[in-house]
Amino acid sequence: TDETPPAADVLIAQLLAKIDARGHGHREIVFEPGRSLVGNAGVLLTEVMFLKPGEQKNFCVVDAAMNDLMRPALYEAFMGIVNTRRREGATEVWDVVGPVCESGDWLGRDRQLSVQPGDVLAVLSAGAYGMTMASNYNTRGRAAEVMVDGSQAWVIREREVPADLFKHEHLLPN
C-alpha cells in the first residue's frame, strides 16, 4: 500500500466533498493529523551490524529494532530505506531486520540494497509516532532524537542508558 501521507489540503477537500455529498449542511471536522504533518520530517538512522545471506532470504541485521520504530511490525507499514553511503556495484535483495529475537522485528522486507557492515541506513518518513510508540522491550533504551536545521544539529532527547530503565523501580522492604 502507498504509505505516503496525503497533503492536508487534498485530504480536507476530499472529506468535505464526501460530507457535502451526503447532504450535511453545517460541518465541523476535528481530527488528529499527526503523520501527515510530521511523517516525512523524521528519519531513523541505523547501523548495519552484520549480513546473513541465505539460500531463500538475505538478512541485513541493523542496530535499530521494532522497539525503535513499531509501524512496520504493527501495521506492516512500508518504510523507504536507503544507504547513506553510495556504493558502486550490484545490489541484492535484503530483509532489513533488528537484533530483537522476534519474528516481527523487521524494518523492511525485500529491499534492493548494496550494503556492508558499518553502513548507516536511513529509514525514511519515520517522523510520526516513532518516539511515542517506542518501548524499552528487551531492555533496550530508546534512541536519541536530534533536531536538524540546515547545517546545525541539536540533541533534543538523550539516548536512554540501562540505568534510565530502572531508576523508577523500587525494591520491597524486607
Regions found by a protein language model. Name each.
Residues 25-174:
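Charged (often Lys/Glu-rich) extended helix/loop segments that serve as interaction or gating elements
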Residues 1-7, 34-37:
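Active-site-proximal beta-alpha loop/turn segments in soluble metabolic enzymes
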